[in-house]
Structures are given as structure tokens and as C-alpha cells.
Amino acid sequence: MIRLLLTKFKNILLLLLIGVMVLTSMHTSYADEYFKYTVEQDYINISVETMSQAPQRQCEVIIRAGEYQGKAGKRIYVNNATVKLPDDIPLRNDGDGKGFYVSEWDINVKEAKALVEKLQARGINAKLQIAYSKSEDLNAAGRIANKSNPYLYVSLHHNYYDANSTGYFSMYNQNDTQGKAVADRLSNAIANNGQVPMRDSRANDGYIGELNVINKTTTPVLLELGFFSNISELEKICSDSYVQYVSTQLANEITSIIKNK
């Protein structure tokens, strides 16, 4: 009797073991089939967790015009300077006694609009993201972009430091090898602009809010396209020739990235 019970117990254990092995095999096959993406293949880093949480992809690329309209500090006052600007970059005055200034937001919007127009002309499903209030800035900008879940998120900015600073550079998230690859490609694409020198790409160490919150299914890159604190460089980055060159070369490179993903 005891021997019979032991035999039945062994059979039950064997069946349970087989069941566990089958379930494990099914889970592995599912993961391999639906979540097997490489950086080179798809320009994104996908995991089971992030894929299940990410919304449906609504566009291929989001181009964000950095900052929001009227943001304090993102401007250069030009009261005592002679500045040559195109008609679409206004001299603003808030009536606060500080005088006339050029807003970074206006420069960013000009470049972003030109880039989106060229991407769409090349058949890329690109969206333009412009912020008009503080509620759409920093981390909020990243959360807004996440709703569209693009392959690529490119945020266009211009830098401010001192009157002699010069150059453009790109930024990517730390430990994001694909982000670095895209950042380098975009920087190299505009290296021959003849007006603003290229600097090395830099890793975001956590202080750039919009990059911190972007979905892991999206590759985020931020471009600082020149220093508007330098009057000479301000004139260059606002010029139609610079904007057209940069937007054309970026559009070509982004199109190549998307179509060969």
C-alpha cells in the first residue's frame, strides 16, 4: 500500500515538473517573439514592462521647440547693441523698464517649424510641440510627448552663458547608447554649416527634466544650436541661411534614421 502511494506521489511530482517546464517555455517564446528588439534594428530600448505600459505610437518623430513663451531668463536684452535680425524674430518689450530683448523661444520655434515642415515633405510622420505656458515645460514637455510615443524625440534649444561663448552640441541620457549614437549623428549632420562650430555631445546627468521622463520606447535627444548670449552668434542662429541649412541637414539625417530603423 505504501509503495503504491509513493509511486502515485512520484507521478504527480513528475506531472507538476513537466507543467512548470511547459509554462516557462511558453513565456520565453512569447518574450522572444514580441520583445526581441536591438538598438541597431529599431533605435529603441524595449522591455516587457515598458512595452505593456507604452501608449500606441501616434507619430514617428516629435520636434519640440524648447522652453515656453515668455519664460523669464530665456532672453537677451539688446538695448545698447546693434543687432541684425530677420523679420520673423521680434524684438520684445514687456513694459517693465528693462527694455528690448530677443527671446530664445522665438528662435527655437523658427527652427522647429522649419524642421517639421521638411520632415513632413520627406514623408515622415512628424509632430511639432510648442509650449505656451509653464504647465507645458520641463518634465511636463516629456509627459506630453509620451502620449504620442514617437520613435524619436528631438528638443531644439539655444544656449546662454556669456558674450563670448560659441558653438552647438547635442545631449542624450546617460547610459543610453542609442541616444548617444543619434545625438552624434545629428551633430555631425550640421558640422559643415560654416557659421557655428561643433562641440562634443554631452550626457544628461539628470538635470534636463524633459529627457528624464521620456518613455523607454522613445530615443530622446536635445540640441543646443548656438549661444544667443553672444550677439554675433545670435545674428547667425537667427538668420534664414543658418535655419535653412540646419533644418535641411537634420531632416535628412532624421529621415535616414527613421527609414532604416
Which residue ranges define each predicted feature?
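Bacterial N-terminal signal peptides that target proteins for export
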Residues: 4-13
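Bacterial N-terminal signal peptides
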Residues: 15-24
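Sec-dependent signal peptide cleavage junction
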Residues: 23-37
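Active-site histidine-acidic residue metal-binding/catalytic motifs
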Residues: 39-142
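Structural recognition of the beta-strand scaffold that forms the well-ordered cores
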Residues: 60-64, 125-130, 151-156, 169-171, ...
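Solvent-exposed loop/turn segments at secondary-structure junctions
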Residues: 67-70, 132-136, 158-163, 175-178, ...
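A short, glycine/acidic-enriched catalytic loop
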Residues: 73-102, 160-193
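Active-site-adjacent mobile loop/cap segments within catalytic or ligand-binding domains
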Residues: 153-155, 159-162, 202-261
